[in-house]
Structures are given as C-alpha cells and as structure tokens.
Amino acid sequence: MVKMIALYKQPQDKEKFDEHYFQTHVPITAKIPGLRNMKVTKITGTPMGGESEYYLLCEMYYDSYESFKEAMKTSEAKASAKDLMSFAGDIVTLMVGEEVEND
C-alpha cells in the first residue's frame, strides 16, 4: 500500500482553513481515480502537552506506486493540486511513502 501524506502547519485562520478544506478540498480530492482511502487527523498537540507547529495530517491510500503515479496524471488530481496551492501552498508539505510490515 502506498500513501501520499499531506502535513499542514498551523493556518493563520483555522476556521477559514477548515471550511475550505472540508467543504471544498476534500470533495475534490475524493474524486481522484485509484484513491482507496483518505484519513484526516487534526493534530491536538505534542506528547509533552505543548502546541504543535502542525495542524492537520491527511493520508491518501493507493494500491501501488504505479497506481499512484497514474492517479497523479488525471484531471481530478490536477484539480486537487490546483486547489491545494490556492489555499495552503505555503503551509503544506507533501510526501509519498510505502507501508512496511513489522516482522
């Protein structure tokens, strides 16, 4: 299983961010062909009780790296990327990883 991870720093206006993210961006992203699952986590703090520099984490799951690459070529993925850059381009870090089994 391959996943793309989007890690967002604290936005200046959390209410405005949440409204756009959940009402606009998530529905656009959910249309990407090959996307198997999308999990969103709001970061609530650090293990020591402090405030985290991060606000939100989104994990988007694909069957394989090949299916992920194909998905990124679609108009739906391009629409998601365009929307992402319009509201969070300065606070998001994107990465791709492959899940591994602990033996």
Q: What is the role of each PLM region?
A:
Residues 1-103:
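Macromolecular interaction modules
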